[in-house]
Amino acid sequence: MYKRQQQTYIDKLEKMEIEIKPEQMMISNHVAIKYLKEYYEGKRLYIVGTPLLKHEFETAGFVLTEEDPDIVLLGFDTTLNYEKLKKACQYIRNGCIYFGMNEDLNCPMEGGTFIPDCGSMARLIEASTGRFPEFFGKPSKYTLDYIIKETGCKPEEIAIVGDRLYTDIAVADGSEVTSILVLSGESSREDVEKSDIKPDYIVKDLSEIIR
């Protein structure tokens, strides 16, 4: 069901010489599809997203539409254009249920650069409509609940490792899950000092964890 996008991440990890099985890879698509199937079965979706994201939801049995949707779902859309924005804003203003995939503001690229991620697109739409989506990805409670249920692990047996305070580390905030911030990405020690979100551990990079 989610194999195509899931495989994209698995392939990326393999290039980094990290072997992982498909059942070990969980992405926000999994969380969103499971939740929407459980609570909004049969609803029509307008997806602001890439063809790959739309394919994932079509394969999962959802009805996608360009007109009169019940739900607007905002993804990390590298094919975003004005027509998509216009439609999304119109449907959201008209009262559609509104969800977002992930709250990340920026997506890191090779060479240390960043491009706008789903969270930035959500803020753009909020500026026009006054509405902000409920997200499925970190730090959403849906993500942590999904991980616990799918792995069968207890919260105290889980460690969340990431480079973003407001998503990766925040998802573990207020729980028994251990949070580990790596400084090899978006957040810095200065960000930690200024933030109310505090990781349990701070490391320079992943190599410090596996020593």
Where are these regions (language model features)?
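Active-site loops and adjacent core secondary-structure elements that bind or stabilize anionic groups
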Residues: M1
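Asp-based, Mg2+/Mn2+-dependent phosphohydrolase catalytic module
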Residues: R4-M26, I33-R211
